[in-house]
């Protein structure tokens, strides 16, 4: 069968190649035909060997993190949980515990703000989607960016989201755009976006307001980002950027009396982009967390469990099936993986590989 593998760490992308079939699965596994594999930023970092999850990988290497597949015997479609299989292949054997069925019979998710949210998405029958009504390409393209904020808000934040003000730092990124919609769906009263460019912020659906972080360059002295007074009290910060802007947000955010500011670092674009930015903790004044009621957490596999992810998947998939994608999704056959990986025309979209 065919697969897409990274041959060397100096290679810019995976190459289309042939590998042996996986063979019959043991009883604890299912063999799936892979339908779609998303290529988010983390997969590109893994392909270059610079993501922590790729540090001990051996070559040739499949950098995928998750995917959508179908059991050809039953017709049931499954989401393959992160880091549980090499998905850039035509077929894959996966432990049953690492599969979430995209079919009727899953527990119905309960929205935090009633049976229907402000965007008209009703969840009363959310899990009653038959596999054939779900678009595997859309699920594969959306699940990573949407799950980042969904899991952060559902498992890494104390208390309800309903009525809170959520600030999304990095709101113009794909995950940031999704985070705005997720926060809205889960009941946030106000969502504020922060990013470098006003033009990009104007195109983010669901914001109540935005703040531009400007062109703060590493090494500048006497320059510090601060939130304007009109933002008002902030309850939750979802940070996809990190760096000095994140430190500025924590230092300047107004905190409602008797409440705590909950900061969750989901990504760290400032470091990943190689701009020379320091980590937020290097720029955060040491006295700040003793003088302001701030709770600092991270979000990702490890900070929440695989069991948490399995529990949240029915609600997450129901939301994915109904949401309007906040960015373009560009699919390509796996035989074109090398060209689409480096194609400038796909940079504004989420690439999904179809084996």
From Swiss-Prot:
First-level EC class: oxidoreductase
Job of this protein: Probable NADPH-dependent quinone reductase; part of the gene cluster that mediates the biosynthesis of terrequinone A, an antitumor agent. The first step in the biosynthetic pathway for terrequinone A is formation of indole pyruvic acid (IPA) from L-tryptophan by the aminotransferase tdiD. The nonribosomal peptide synthase tdiA then immediately converts unstable IPA to didemethylasterriquinone D (DDAQ D), via condensation of 2 IPA molecules. The symmetric connectivity of the 2 IPA molecules is thought to arise by head-to-tail dual Claisen condensations facilitated by the TE domain.
Pathway assigned to this chain's UniProt record: Secondary metabolite biosynthesis
Keyword line: NADP, Oxidoreductase
Keyword DNA damage part of the UniProt annotation: no
Name this protein carries in UniProt: Probable NADPH-dependent quinone reductase tdiC
GO molecular function ontology, one term from the record: oxidoreductase activity
Gene3D superfamilies recorded: NAD(P)-binding Rossmann-like Domain
Annotated EC: 1.1.1.-
Annotated source species: Emericella nidulans (strain FGSC A4 / ATCC 38163 / CBS 112.46 / NRRL 194 / M139)
